[in-house]
Amino acid sequence: ETENLFSLLENQPESKDSIIDIYNAMIEEANRKNIALAFKYASTPSGLARLFMTRNYIDKDTLRQVLASLPTDMQKSKMGLNIKAHLDTEQLSVGSTLVPFPCVTEENVEFDWNQLKGKQILLLYGGLGCMGDEGREYLKTLYKQTNREDLEIVLYWPSSSIEDLKSVKEHYVGNDYAFVSDFKLDASPIRIKYGCQATPTCFLTDKDHIIVVKSEG
């Protein structure tokens, strides 16, 4: 259904507002159903994973109560600990300062966040496939038409290995901005501290690395 909406958006740009309203309503309904299923099956591995997936849409007090009601082994599982980390962490939002975290490039070289000092940053969480050709071309053009002294684009990819990160970089050939990952998947700071779930999630900062825009999807 979402693909049909995106197709409509391309073919009927004059209906953009109405199509976006429909899309938002679909997302809201999907989230409502996912949360209900997460609560119902929270004591199972798949339900706990769904609970983590919907964490950003659940009040933390409620989420804490649900987690506390689960068997100890579920609470101490990887996903249970990820949910606890989410609960114990204040997520970044507009007005927050970007928080560097250890990660590497596709060449397995530690990414140096210090090189970004004094520059605006556009940090993206995944999403190159989701954004389509138009979105990828926009990023390429933005990178080429801006000065690296003013703006850096950093793409975090949720890879499980350096080989996976390399293959992603090779697949999206021609994208010269930085590709990075820490291979921690759901336990990564990009998921816990930054609160990323939907792809792409984008953070635009000012030159002091204060987040001025955050967008999802």
Give the label of every model feature segment:
Residues 3, 42-53:
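Amphipathic alpha-helical repeat scaffolds of TPR domains
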Residues 174, 184-217:
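Thiol/disulfide oxidoreductase modules built on the thioredoxin-like
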Residues 34, 62-71, 97-108:
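Alpha-helical repeat scaffolds
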Residues 1-32, 36:
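A non-transmembrane, solvent-exposed segment enriched in polar/low-complexity residues
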Residues 111-139, 152:
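Short active-site neighborhood of thiol/selenol oxidoreductases, capturing the structured segment around
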Residues 81-113:
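N-terminal "domain-start" segment that seeds a small globular fold
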Residues 134-173, 185-191:
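Structural microenvironment flanking redox-active thiols in thiol-disulfide oxidoreductases
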